[in-house]
């Protein structure tokens, strides 16, 4: 198992017969048995591997009421030993219930909260899970319908890096959260109940890094192959950081490039007008453009490795055309069969 579980608990928020949301609080933590360990380890791996997460911090309470400090205050009491985990999670459940009550669409769900350690960091994982119906076959071969937690489709989840939060009060990225489909951020109510404010535009930072790398190789005396090797090295480093759940560190990345004979990237990135943070989370989908070109439009989808540009793939911006030399075998087969049938 990749995590060490300290506490875990589940509370239920559901509608009563009058349509009002109510909390059903569990009076003690979940027993750290095999089922809990397997579930939380799976959730940790799934969450860590999710691309496109947002990052934020506990906001300062303002007149607009968007940064409610109640969750952060309760968490501070829990970490300071003035509040037990069960009491803290119960307060959090009631805060979420109050926030959900502001919306007509809410059906509630199961609030899972867990404190655990992974490598050298302490985390608080918070997720609102839903139940999903499924069928099973009984011993007598009859079918039976039951409900189970839908762990494969988590849309409302956040994770607080407690170690970073307590060590660096100026950090604006110790809370990560899942963004919804089509690039939308997680439902506002889930961030609001925690008093979380988005602090780091991860995609923008990764896009800026990519631009800095492109400018760096363009201004260098590297050959075409060496330039692509540089791009690949940057992507490899950033992918490793993403898989480890660690931030990209510009100085560390520059040292990696220096080991490959590509000096001065740090001075180049910091000396320009790139406005890059020293550290920020990786976004694979953005940085993948260092290795691949891809696009979709007008019923055409095209994707190819960057190293093929100018060789197997010729782009002419004047005529707005792309010439592909050496059509992929499976595509060639489809095209040949279609032409024979016409």
UniProtKB/Swiss-Prot annotation:
One of its GO terms (cellular component) is bacterial nucleoid. The keyword Cytoplasm applies. GO terms for molecular function: double-stranded DNA binding; single-stranded RNA binding. Transmembrane segments: none annotated. Pfam families: NA37. It comes from the Bacteria. Keywords: Cytoplasm. It is found in: Cytoplasm, Nucleoid. NCBIfam families: PRK00378.1. Belongs to the YejK family. This is Nucleoid-associated protein Sbal_2534.
């Amino acid at each position: 198992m990749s995590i060490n579980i300290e506490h875990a608990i589940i509370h239920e928020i559901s509608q009563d017969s009058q349509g009002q949301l109510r909390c059903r609080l569990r009076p003690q933590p979940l027993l750290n048995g095999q089922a809990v360990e397997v579930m939380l380890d799976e959730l940790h791996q799934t969450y860590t591997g999710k691309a496109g997460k947002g990052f934020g911090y506990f906001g300062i309470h303002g007149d607009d009421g968007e940064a409610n400090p109640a969750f952060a205050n309760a968490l501070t009491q829990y970490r300071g030993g003035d509040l037990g985990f069960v009491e803290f999670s119960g307060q959090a459940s009631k805060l979420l219930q109050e926030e959900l009550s502001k919306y007509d669409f809410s059906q509630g769900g199961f609030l899972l909260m867990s404190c655990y350690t992974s490598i050298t960091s302490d985390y608080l994982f918070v997720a609102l899970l839903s139940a999903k119906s499924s069928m099973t076959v009984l011993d007598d071969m009859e079918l039976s319908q039951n409900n189970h937690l839908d762990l494969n489709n988590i849309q409302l989840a956040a994770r607080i890096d407690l170690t970073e939060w307590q060590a660096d009060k100026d950090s604006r990225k110790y809370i990560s959260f899942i963004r919804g489909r089509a690039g939308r951020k997680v439902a506002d109510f889930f961030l609001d109940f925690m008093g979380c404010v988005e602090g780091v535009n991860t995609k923008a930072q990764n896009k800026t890094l990519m631009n800095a790398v492109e400018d760096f190789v363009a201004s260098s005396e590297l050959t075409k192959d060496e330039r692509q090797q540089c791009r690949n090295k940057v992507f490899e480093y950033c992918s490793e950081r993403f898989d480890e759940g660690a931030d990209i560190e510009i100085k560390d990345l520059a040292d990696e490039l220096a080991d490959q004979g590509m000096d001065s990237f740090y001075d180049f990135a910091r000396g320009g007008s790139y406005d890059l943070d020293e550290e920020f989370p990786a976004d694979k989908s953005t940085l993948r453009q260092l290795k691949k070109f891809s696009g979709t439009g007008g019923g055409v989808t095209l994707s190819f490795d960057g190293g093929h540009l100018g060789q197997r793939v010729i782009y002419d911006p004047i005529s707005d055309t792309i010439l592909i030399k050496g059509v992929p075998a499976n595509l060639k087969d489809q095209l040949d069969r279609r032409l024979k049938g016409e």
